[in-house]
A protein has these predicted regions:
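Serine-esterase "nucleophile elbow" of acetyl-processing enzymes
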Residues: 1-48, 52-54, 58-70, 75
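Alpha-helical cap/lid subdomain in secreted, periplasmic
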Residues: 38, 57-213
């Protein structure tokens, strides 16, 4: 049995937007690990529409408040989709690739020096439903070509830093079970079934298992 407090730091895909059970993949992941006998505390620090540059100013303070050094703590970053998005009416991505990489480097380096750290990359969008307009006010256009480009760059960066990286873009894109929930969602946020599949991918990831088993 492993006792561990974990901060899941990210955006709406971390928060679980679109999941009618409001668990997202972190809640489902930790729920299943509890069934295996592990004593996990799950802190979901996902904020809708956050990019890497919006996460960067907040992650350390939010994690510090939840991970006192007297307890075993760890951090899982999960971001990138919003960096690749183009806001409707603009012709620029929200965070250019080089800026996104520099921001990710600073966060991952700082986190790794403090706590065990994992990085989970962006996942594929459903292009037939673009742009995504959940609020009715702002629309964001996601494209898999851009997501794939950022994903490859994040994977390379994580390798350089020695931070384990989960390529969800590849893992979900290659899994036929992703097709239905991807199409059933709004174009980027799947319903519950999609988050369950993401939780399954994380649960089977060797880097995650090393924390627990």
């Amino acid at each position: 049995m492993t006792a561990l407090r974990i901060c899941f730091v990210g955006d709406s895909l971390t928060a679980g937007t679109g999941d009618d059970r409001f668990l997202g993949w972190p809640g489902r992941l930790c729920q299943e690990e509890r069934k295996r006998g592990h004593d996990l505390t799950c802190y979901n620090l996902g904020i809708r529409a956050d990019t890497s540059t919006l996460i960067a100013p907040r992650w350390r303070a939010e994690c510090t408040a939840r991970l006192p050094d007297i307890y075993q703590g760890a951090i899982v970053f999960a971001f990138g989709n919003n960096d690749t998005a183009v806001q409707v009416g603009s012709d620029q991505v929200r965070v250019p690739l080089e800026e996104s990489l520099a921001t990710a480097r600073a966060m991952l380096s700082g986190a790794k020096a403090w706590k065990p750290t994992l990085f989970i990359g962006p996942w594929p969008c459903e292009e037939s439903k673009q742009p995504v307009n959940p609020s009715g006010l702002l629309g964001y256009d996601f494209r898999n070509t851009r997501i794939g480009e950022y994903n490859d760059a994040y994977a390379k960066l994580a390798g350089e830093l020695g931070v384990p990286y989960l390529d969800l873009y590849g893992a979900l894109g290659a899994d036929p079970r992703w097709l239905q929930p991807s199409r059933a969602g709004d174009g980027i946020h799947p319903p519950a079934e999609g988050y369950s599949l993401v939780a399954e991918k994380v649960a089977g990831w060797a880097a995650w298992r090393r924390w627990l088993d």
